[in-house]
Amino acid sequence: MSTPRLLVDREIVERNIREMQDLATSRRIKLRPHIKAHKCLEIMNMQLKAGSSGITVAKLGEAETMHKGGAQDIFVAYPLVGEEKLDRLVALAQVAEVTVAVDNLEVAERMAERFTDTRPIGVLIEVDSGLKRCGVLPDEAVDLARALLAVPNLKLKGVFTHAGQVYGATPEKVHEIGLMEAHTVVAVRDALEKYDITIETVSTGSTPTAKHNVEVAGVTEIRPGNYVWNDAIQVGLGVARLSQCALTVEATVVSSPMPGRLVIDAGSKVLGLDKGAHGLSIVTGYGRIIGWPELTIERLSEEHGVVTFLGAAPAIGQKVRIVPNHACVVVNLAEALWVNDREYWSVAARGRSD
C-alpha cells in the first residue's frame, strides 16, 4: 500500500474503549466520550455499544455528521454564536437530544429565542478550572445559573469543565490537576444547591485526568476523547504506554542524503506540528518511530519528515511506523483509516470545524 497512511490496531482500540467504560461503570459515572479525537462513525458506534451515555463534540458540524451515523444524545461543548449556527442547532435539536455549552448570558438568550416553538434547549454552564479559555470563574457560576433559570425555553442541566492545562503539566502533576478539576465543579454544584438550584450533570473531562476525576464524589460524567488512540503526548504524561497506542502513521524512507540524516514521506500535512498543546514540551521530535528509539523526527516540511540518528537506521524504501504526538490532529488531516490492513474506515467528520 502507498504511504503515508494511518494504521489502526482494532484490538487496542477495543481494549482502550472497554477499559475506560469499565472505569466509569465501576464508579457509576456516565462516560460521554469526545469524538473529536477520532471523527469516525465506526469508533463512535463501538463506544456507544460498550455503554457510553452519548457523545461529546467540539463543533456543530461534528454533531450533524455523528447524528447521521446514529448518535442520538449529543453534547456540543462549545458556545454557538451566529444565526446560521442557530438555524442548524434548531434543526438538529428536532431530531436528537442536544445539549449546548454556555458561559455567557447574552449568547444563551439569543439561542433560547430560537426555541419558542420547540421543546427547551438544554445547556451546561462551562466553568474555568484553570485552563483560562472559555468558562466562567467558579464564583461567577451561581450568578449565571440564576440568570439562566429566568430565560424562557432554556433548561439548565448542569455544569462542566475541562482542565486542558494538564497537557502542560509534568506527569507528577496529572493526579493533582485531575482532582482539582473535579473538586471545582462539585463545589459549584454545592454552591448552586444553597440557592435551591438542583442540577443533574457535573461533568469533567480529558484523557489524562479521567481516572482521577472519578475519585471525587459528586462527579456524574467524564468526557475523555484521546483514550481510544493514546499517543506520544499521553505516553509523555505517563498516562499510557506505547503498547496502548492504537494509531500509527506508516511512512517510507525516501532519501538518505548524508550520514546521520534520512527523510520520510510523512511531513506536517500528515504528522501535524503539535509538540504539546499547552506549554510544557513532553515529547521529543514529531512522533516516536516504533522499533527505532535512536531515531528522532527532528523537523517537518509539508511533505518531508527529516529524521536524525546515530548508528543503525532503516534503508531507503523501508517502511516505518510512527506513534504521532497528537492523534486527534493527525486523524483530522486524513481521509481514511486502515484497520488491521483489512478494513477501511472513513474519517466521516474530517474538517467539520464549522
Label every PLM stretch briefly.
Residues 13, 36, 66, 125, ...:
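Conserved, mostly hydrophobic/aromatic
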Residues 121, 128-241:
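Active-site loop/helix belt of alpha/beta enzymes
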Residues 1-8:
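Generic N-terminal amphipathic, Lys/Arg-enriched alpha-helix
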Residues 260-354:
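C-terminal accessory subdomain/extension
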